[in-house]
Amino acid sequence: MDNSNWTSVSHFVLLGISTHPEEQIPLFLVFSLMYAINISGNLAIITLILSAPRLHIPMYIFLSNLALTDICFTSTTVPKMLQIIFSPTKVISYTGCLAQTYFFICFAVMENFILAVMAYDRYIAICHPFHYTMILTRMLCVKMVVMCHALSHLHAMLHTFLIGQLIFCADNRIPHFFCDLYALMKISCTSTYLNTLMIHTEGAVVISGALAFITASYACIILVVLRIPSAKGRWKTFSTCGSHLTVVAIFYGTLSWVYFRPLSSYSVTKGRIITVVYTVVTPMLNPFIYSLRNGDVKGGFMKWMSRMQTFFFR
């Protein structure tokens, strides 16, 4: 491409999910509702865990961190998407775009690490139940959460720095509802070889490493569960992992489909749809998945609601 067509852009134009005017109001209403459910549901999980002393154990400490990550993850993209739906310009500044990319990557990877830590918690609880409190001490839990945050920020810094090295053409329209890595790479005038290489190597190690750790944890859990003599006992033990497995399947399935494939085969339209699933739908469903399948959370929630009812209607 002729170098005269290259430019240092000051802003990008986010085209959003749809360019059809008649779809804008329904999209705004649907995503506003999902965002409200996500924020309220995850805040309820955090508040419940903080207010119930019996839930101050590693499993629920990690769950509250997952809920906080989900709030931040969705808040990185949805408010801006709702704004541009009715904006005549649909503009995001260059700096704002890089910041959005940074925090999106950071919270996506943080969720990845927290899901791996939660799998380790289930492994210790089922495979070493008598040593659970000795192994998963409060200090170890804090260290693991801090490590999740630190590694997530380092990962985000690397990929955001590489995006910042790209040069963009005069056409600065991003066919997406946020500054997604692949969408930005698609409109770059310069080679994205290093970006793609890092996604498929360092990125793959981060994501696949966590997924392999989760798989190994559940392989050990299954071996222990199979030794339980009664079918009822096996089901009761393994059912404690059902919520986590559901979230893992949705999160890694959609994430792998979007990012771990050649850039040439990346479909913007399909990418937008799949991205909505793991950036909006999954964080919205997580509180319901964990609360509906968890007796402690359901019991704590009912007690919390009872206290609220007594407080407001006494």
From Swiss-Prot:
What is the disulfide pattern of this chain?
97-189
UniProt keyword annotation of Transmembrane helix present:
yes
Gene3D superfamilies per UniProt = Rhodopsin 7-helix transmembrane proteins (1.20.1070.10)
Kindly state which keywords UniProt assigns to this record, in alphabetical order: Cell membrane, Disulfide bond, G-protein coupled receptor, Glycoprotein, Membrane, Olfaction, Receptor, Sensory transduction, Transducer, Transmembrane, Transmembrane helix
Where does the source fall among the domains of life? Eukaryota
Which residues carry attached sugars according to the database record? 5
Query: What CDD domains does the entry give?
Result: 7tmA_OR1A-like
Q: Does the keyword Disulfide bond apply?
A: yes
- Its GO biological process terms? sensory perception of smell; signal transduction
| Residue ranges, Cytoplasmic side | 50-57, 121-139, 220-236, 293-314
List where in the cell it is found: Cell membrane
Which InterPro entries does the entry mention? Answer: GPCR_Rhodpsn, GPCR_Rhodpsn_7TM, Olfact_rcpt
SUPFAM superfamilies for the chain? Family A G protein-coupled receptor-like
Q: Which PROSITE patterns match?
A: G_PROTEIN_RECEP_F1_1, G_PROTEIN_RECEP_F1_2
Mode of membrane association? Multi-pass membrane protein
Identify one Gene Ontology CC term for this UniProt entry.
plasma membrane
Q: Name one GO molecular function term.
A: olfactory receptor activity
Q: List the ranges whose topology is Extracellular.
A: 1-25, 80-100, 159-195, 260-272
Function comment: Odorant receptor.
Write out the similarity annotation: Belongs to the G-protein coupled receptor 1 family.
Q: What is the protein name stated in its UniProt record?
A: Olfactory receptor 1Q1
Species this chain originates from: Homo sapiens (Human)
